[in-house]
UniProtKB/Swiss-Prot annotation:
Species this protein is from: Drosophila melanogaster (Fruit fly)
The ARM repeat ranges on this chain: 235-275, 287-331, 332-374, 375-418
Domain of life according to the entry: Eukaryota
Keyword set includes Repeat: yes
Family of this protein: Belongs to the ARMC6 family.
Protein name: Armadillo repeat-containing protein 6 homolog
Record carries keyword Protease: no
């Protein structure tokens, strides 16, 4: 079994090489690695690329954390040195997860929290110190959500309630919350159990592009379900609670923005929060459908924006009356136009076909509305353009099946465009979606071999 050493032991030898033998940091590290490897020691657990102070031989990250701790409680008006130390810690933490773990072990998180608390307790908080501290704690918390604790949450609430001239402090606070949410269900639940949501709601408004994007990201991250350590998460309940506070506000913000990125984030967030039928109805009643159609029509060339719009429409169509309103208000020509404009983009094509699938499911009138736009030929051409893309072929088969299953009068038109050969080729190319394609061929009235997947064997023969 290979021998191992601690990071401190490795760092002490590097320091000795720098101080005692006047080596440069890079020479000292090389020599240390050779020494330990010659002794048969496994260095897999050691951070070998730590920045080292050439004067003291100490790792920069350790020295920086110690210097920040020294500043706490001194209440010095001169903050230049402190800001430099915070910038150094930020830069070191950005290098790798190993650097962040080491900083955390050396007490960087507690030091930054104490520094933030001390700064916030002042009569007029120093915004520069707040910004640099938040930048450092953002870098430190990245992929380390376990560091976020009750003290950190208390600081976040103070920061959200703080009236500052620059919105930079608020943006950094929201980014910190996002990092605390990723892959950590308990953090999400703890955040939802505080007044954070009520403090964030007033921040939503017109002309706040960056703020709206960061806020919507926090709302989405609060409804993640990505923590394998927790058997059951509260994603649905969180979505319901957040929707109750901000859903209508988000819908009302849609006409206020022109930036495609802001609009895409708003649409994505609305779709993420629309987890119940009554919420879908509320979005419809607030004029959400009209806004979405206007956004799609005036931004036909925007890939991400239209993909999110299609996903949102598909989510809203889960409520039958809203599904009817979507089709009645004229979505079919818009989706056809999108398919024509972005026929080479497999992501838009897949999203558009999935949307057609949902909107035409079990409703003959909806199928007719799409068919009358001439979308059949466009769908066939889209399938022809992406023969290797399994999701496009599967979604196309779904869309065709739903359109013709209650409208057999369409079959002849579909077949005249050569869809049968395309589907048969897709079935050979993508065996995993064979059943989906066979369902489309069956409802088109084409020849299809339906194989019996499983046959039982009876102990006694059943008479014919």
């Amino acid at each position: 079994m290979a021998k191992v050493i601690s990071q401190d032991t490795f760092d002490d030898v590097v320091k000795e090489n720098v101080v005692e033998f006047s080596m440069t940091p890079s020479e000292a590290k090389e020599e240390t690695i050779k020494q330990f490897e010659a002794q048969g020691i496994n260095l897999a657990n050691i951070i070998k690329d730590l920045s080292v102070n050439p004067q003291t031989g100490q790792p920069v990250i350790n020295e920086t954390v110690d210097k920040i701790k020294e500043h706490i409680g001194q209440k010095l008006e001169e903050t230049t040195e402190l800001l430099e130390q915070l910038a150094t810690l930020d830069a070191e933490c950005k290098k790798s997860l190993a650097h962040r773990v080491l900083a955390g072990k050396n007490g960087a998180h507690d030091a930054l929290i104490t520094l933030l608390e001390e700064t916030l307790s002042a009569e007029s908080p120093n915004e520069s110190v707040l910004k640099k501290s938040l930048e450092a704690i953002n870098s430190l918390t990245h992929k380390q959500p376990d560091l976020f604790d009750a003290e950190a949450m208390a600081v976040v609430l103070k920061l959200l309630a703080l009236k500052v001239e620059s919105e930079e402090v608020t943006l950094l606070t929201l980014q910190w919350l996002q990092k605390a949410c990723i892959m950590h269900e308990m953090n999400r639940q703890n955040i939802m159990n505080t007044s954070a949501l009520k403090l964030m709601k007033p921040l939503l408004g017109k002309g706040k592009d960056r703020l709206v994007r960061e806020l919507t990201a926090v709302f989405r991250f609060l409804v993640l379900d990505d923590d394998i350590r927790v058997e059951f998460g509260c994603a649905h309940e969180h979505a319901r609670q957040i929707a109750g506070e901000v859903l209508i506000t988000l819908v009302e913000l849609l006409p206020a923005y022109q930036d495609p990125n802001v609009l895409a984030d708003l649409l994505l967030t609305i779709g993420t929060l629309a987890v119940r039928q009554e919420l879908c109805t509320a979005i419809d009643e607030a004029g959400g459908l009209k806004s979405v159609f206007e956004i799609m029509s005036s931004n036909l060339d925007e890939v991400r924006l239209n993909r999110e719009a299609l996903k949102l429409l598909r989510a809203l169509a889960g409520q039958d009356s809203v599904k009817s309103h979507i089709v009645q208000q004229g979505v079919a020509p818009i989706i056809k136009q999108l398919l024509e404009t972005h026929q080479s983009n497999e992501n838009i094509v897949a999203a558009a076909l999935a949307c057609v699938t949902t909107l035409t499911l079990r409703v003959q009138e909806h199928s007719a509305a799409f068919f009358d736009t001439g979308i059949a030929e466009v769908i066939v051409e889209a399938l022809r353009a992406h023969p290797k893309h399994k999701i496009v072929q599967r979604n196309g088969a779904w869309a065709i099946r739903n359109m013709v299953s209650r409208s057999r009068n369409q079959c002849e038109t579909w077949i005249s465009f050569g869809v049968e050969d395309l589907l048969n080729m897709a079935m050979k190319e993508h065996p995993s979606v064979e059943q989906d394609i066979k369902a489309a061929l069956r409802d088109l009235g084409c020849s299809v071999h339906l194989r019996e997947e499983w046959t039982g064997t009876a102990e006694k023969k059943i008479a014919a």
